[in-house]
Structures are given as structure tokens and as C-alpha cells.
């Protein structure tokens, strides 16, 4: 479940060459992780157009903030790996009744965080980086609780890597700041989130 052969070279970007596509990355990870699984449907959420667009914009914003294509790529790759592994556990009924309660709590918290992301963008002067950061960190803690008995410390490290980045108050300040590049990223992220909310996916 938690092995990652070829971790060092997978997905590295050559200097000066910008080539990033979250759908392609999700499909690569899906093929690798699920090569021995009966179903390939578990990653559908990550490979639909709307989710791919959101991940692409998160990559661009992360690349701009970190000034590192490699780091931004790793953040999104960790998002995909976490989602795939949790999806496998969920679809194979590996969670106990108590853990399923944690799943529901996580879904509600993610829904709250998603609506907050959009609200802070759509309603002027409402952005509060502390509130949004706290919501994302609560999502992180619920995920740790959920996979405690299922995944390795490496996966827990990925969860920290992803949520600590997106909950970074300095990153959130830049994302919601006046920069046109970040505003474009945020608008597309919120458009995608609104679609997922309307569809009941989030």
C-alpha cells in the first residue's frame, strides 16, 4: 500500500522546461498504486476536468510562492497519493465504524473549508488568514486520525507536507493579495470549487 519505488526520479522537471499537468500526474500515480487492484475508478475525482483544473492552479500558485517547480510538483503529487490511498481504503471497506465517523467529520470540515475559500474570495474585505489556516489544519488532523492504523509515517509526512503548505498564513496572504497572477489562480480555484459544491462532490 505505501511503497514508492522510483521515488527519487519520478515526475522531476528538467531545468527550463515547464510541463505540468495534474491529470497526467494523477493517472501515473493511479496506474502505479492501483496496478494490482481490481478497480481503477478510485481516482476519478482527481482526473475529472474540474478537479484537474483546481490542482493545476494550486500548482501554479505554489510554484510562484515557493519559487520552485520541484517543490510545487511534489506538493501536488503528495495530494494525489494521499487521495488515492484513502480512496483505496474507503472502497475496500477498510475503515471501522468509528473511522467512518471520522470520514464524515473530515468531509464536513473540507466542505466548510471549501465554502470559506470561496466566500473570502467573493465577499470583499472578509479574508481572514487565521480562520482559513485553522480550518485546513483541522482537516489535516482529521486525516491523521483517519489513517493512523492504515498508512505509514511516510504518508503521515505527506499529509503534513500538503496541509502545512496550504495552511501557511503567508501563502494564504499572497494568494488573497493584490497580485494579478495570484488573483487569476484564486478565481479559477474558486470557480472549480463552486462546480464541485454544486455537484455535491465537496
Swiss-Prot record:
The keyword Transmembrane does not apply. Residues 1-10 have a biased composition (Acidic residues). One of its GO terms (biological process) is regulation of apoptotic process. GO terms for cellular component: cytoplasm; plasma membrane. It comes from the Eukaryota. InterPro entries: TNFAIP8-like, TNFAIP8_sf. Keywords: Cell membrane, Cytoplasm, Lipid transport, Membrane, Transport. Coiled coil: none annotated. Residues 1-21 are annotated as: Disordered. PANTHER family: TUMOR NECROSIS FACTOR ALPHA-INDUCED PROTEIN 8-LIKE PROTEIN 3, TUMOR NECROSIS FACTOR INDUCED PROTEIN. May act as a lipid transfer protein. This is Tumor necrosis factor alpha-induced protein 8-like protein 3. Belongs to the TNFAIP8 family. It is found in: Cytoplasm; Cell membrane. Transmembrane segments: none annotated. The gene is tnfaip8l3. It comes from Danio rerio (Zebrafish).
Amino acid at each position: 500500500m505505501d511503497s514508492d519505488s522510483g521515488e527519487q526520479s519520478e515526475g522531476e522537471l528538467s531545468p527550463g522546461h515547464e510541463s505540468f499537468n495534474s491529470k497526467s500526474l494523477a493517472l501515473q500515480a493511479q496506474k502505479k498504486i492501483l496496478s494490482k487492484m481490481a478497480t481503477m475508478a478510485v481516482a476519478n475525482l482527481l482526473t475529472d476536468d474540474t478537479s484537474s483544473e483546481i490542482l493545476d492552479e494550486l500548482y501554479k500558485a505554489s510554484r510562484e510562492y515557493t519559487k520552485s517547480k520541484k517543490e510545487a510538483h511534489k506538493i501536488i503529487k503528495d495530494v494525489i497519493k494521499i487521495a488515492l490511498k484513502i480512496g483505496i481504503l474507503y472502497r475496500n471497506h477498510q475503515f471501522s465504524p468509528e473511522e467512518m465517523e471520522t470520514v464524515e467529520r473530515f468531509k464536513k470540515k473540507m466542505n466548510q473549508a471549501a465554502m470559506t475559500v470561496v466566500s473570502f474570495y467573493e465577499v470583499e474585505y472578509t479574508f481572514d488568514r487565521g480562520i482559513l489556516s485553522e480550518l485546513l489544519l483541522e482537516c489535516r488532523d482529521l486525516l491523521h486520525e483517519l489513517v493512523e492504523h492504515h498508512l505509514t509515517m511516510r504518508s503521515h509526512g505527506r499529509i503534513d507536507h500538503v496541509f502545512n503548505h496550504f495552511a501557511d498564513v503567508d501563502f494564504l496572504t499572497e494568494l488573497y493579495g493584490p497580485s494579478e497572477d495570484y488573483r487569476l489562480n484564486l478565481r479559477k480555484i474558486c470557480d472549480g470549487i463552486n462546480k464541485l459544491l454544486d455537484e455535491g462532490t465537496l
